């Protein structure tokens, strides 16, 4: 009986653990500097992984960095040279404000607009938290 239980428990851990690990991984941002431009080639993949609208993320970056930008497919281009450290700091701020659940610290959240307010709903613990508007 104990061996059977341990075998089933081990099987359950092998099935569940990979999914739990994926939820906690925050993708790294890639920043490329060109003359008078800053390009983020993996912007679309990041938006998809974080379960956020790519244009919502782009609007946040444009407001925080005070430069215009364009989204072409999965690539986001800022029209102005910005240091990779500055762009990474803005990315971390976006994650803190609009991705991480303040109750359980999970990144498995979704952003909804309820009336005129954005609400972050955690899919892990079920908490709903209003977030500041853009």
Swiss-Prot record:
Tell me yes or no: is Repeat among this UniProt entry's keywords.
no
Q: Which Gene Ontology molecular-function terms are recorded?
A: translation initiation factor activity
- Check the record and name the HAMAP family matching this protein: eIF_2_beta
Gene3D superfamilies named in the record: 3.30.30.170
Instruction: Record the organism.
Output: Pyrobaculum arsenaticum (strain DSM 13514 / JCM 11321 / PZ6)
State the name under which the record lists this protein. Answer: Translation initiation factor 2 subunit beta
Alphabetically list the UniProt keywords.
Initiation factor, Protein biosynthesis
The record's section on Pfam families has: eIF-5_eIF-2B
Subunit info here reads: Heterotrimer composed of an alpha, a beta and a gamma chain.
Record PANTHER family: EUKARYOTIC TRANSLATION INITIATION FACTOR, EUKARYOTIC TRANSLATION INITIATION FACTOR 2 SUBUNIT 2
């Amino acid at each position: 009986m104990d061996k059977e239980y341990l075998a089933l428990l081990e099987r359950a851990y092998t099935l569940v653990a990979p999914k739990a690990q994926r939820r906690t991984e925050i993708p790294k941002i890639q920043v490329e500097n060109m003359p008078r431009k800053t390009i983020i080639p993996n912007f679309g993949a990041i938006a998809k992984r974080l379960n956020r609208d790519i244009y919502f993320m782009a609007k946040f970056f444009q407001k925080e960095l005070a430069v215009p930008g364009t989204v072409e497919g999965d690539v986001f281009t800022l029209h102005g040279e910005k240091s990779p450290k500055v762009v990474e700091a803005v990315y971390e701020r976006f994650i803190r404000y609009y991705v991480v659940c303040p109750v359980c610290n999970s990144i498995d959240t979704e952003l909804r607009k309820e009336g005129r307010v954005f609400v972050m709903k955690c899919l892990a613990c079920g908490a709903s938290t209003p977030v500041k508007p853009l």
